[in-house]
């Protein structure tokens, strides 16, 4: 086994004495820092590399702190208006994961960079911490490399806002197999539209 494989196994055994101590110390360290800050290097180099990170110019790591728990509906004094079924304010569950929220915040803060992917690095009772891999698409090391040229195209601007990253796709119900029949055709809306549209072909 290579070094990265050993590292991967370490992260899979989070309840081991070493990892429990490490995660506890790191969570304390991350809490002292701002909610969004640049990390000098990835905390999990094995995971970052599997997601496409390379230790060369053009790649940036940002660490994001996201508050855990449900989402409160942002309405003044609980005045939601409308029918009683939509009066809920407190017990609202957000449709997307906290990881995709972290990616979105990193993408907003670094508008000139592209979000490649992200991964979990720690959590406590109040916060979850994620590291987001961003790419500078104007750097020659990225533009001249055939493996990374795809992300320089304009169609990939703010992928994280449109649910195109790995974390964003999870809440869209996309995938293969019998569990993902609701999104056959690209999305929930596309599947619903096709199933609820009456097609009267000329030759039928």
Curated annotation (Swiss-Prot):
GO MF terms held by the record: RNA binding; structural constituent of ribosome
GO cellular component assignments: cytosolic large ribosomal subunit
Lipid metabolism in keyword set: no
Keyword annotations from UniProtKB, A to Z: Cytoplasm, Ribonucleoprotein, Ribosomal protein
SMART domains, per the entry: Ribosomal_L15e
Subcellular location, record wording: Cytoplasm
Source taxon at top rank: Eukaryota
GO biological process, one term: cytoplasmic translation
Matches recorded under PANTHER family: LARGE RIBOSOMAL SUBUNIT PROTEIN EL15 (PTHR11847:SF4), RIBOSOMAL PROTEIN L15 (PTHR11847)
Family of this protein: Belongs to the eukaryotic ribosomal protein eL15 family.
Described function: Component of the large ribosomal subunit. The ribosome is a large ribonucleoprotein complex responsible for the synthesis of proteins in the cell.
Assembly behavior: Component of the large ribosomal subunit.
Protein name in the entry: Large ribosomal subunit protein eL15
Organism: Carassius auratus
Name of the gene encoding the protein in the UniProt record: rpl15
């Amino acid at each position: 086994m290579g070094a990265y494989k050993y590292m991967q196994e370490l992260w899979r055994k989070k309840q081991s004495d070493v990892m429990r101590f490490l995660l506890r110390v790191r969570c304390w360290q991350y809490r002292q820092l701002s909610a969004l800050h640049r990390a000098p290097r990835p905390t999990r180099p094995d995971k970052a590399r599997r997601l496409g990170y390379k230790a060369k110019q053009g790649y940036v790591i940002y660490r994001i702190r996201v508050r855990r728990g449900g989402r409160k509906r942002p309405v003044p004094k609980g005045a939601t208006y409308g029918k009683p079924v939509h009066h809920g304010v407190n017990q609202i569950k957000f449709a997307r994961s906290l990881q995709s929220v972290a990616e979105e915040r990193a993408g907003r803060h670094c508008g000139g960079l592209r979000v490649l992917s992200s991964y979990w690095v720690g959590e406590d009772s109040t916060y979850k911490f994620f590291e987001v891999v961003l790419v500078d698409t104007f750097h020659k090391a990225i533009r001249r490399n055939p493996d990374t040229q795809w992300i320089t195209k304009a169609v990939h601007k703010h992928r994280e806002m449109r649910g195109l990253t790995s974390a964003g796709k999870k809440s869209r119900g996309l995938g293969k197999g019998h569990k993902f029949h609701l999104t056959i055709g690209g999305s929930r809306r596309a599947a619903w539209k096709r199933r609820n549209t009456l097609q009267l072909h000329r030759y039928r």
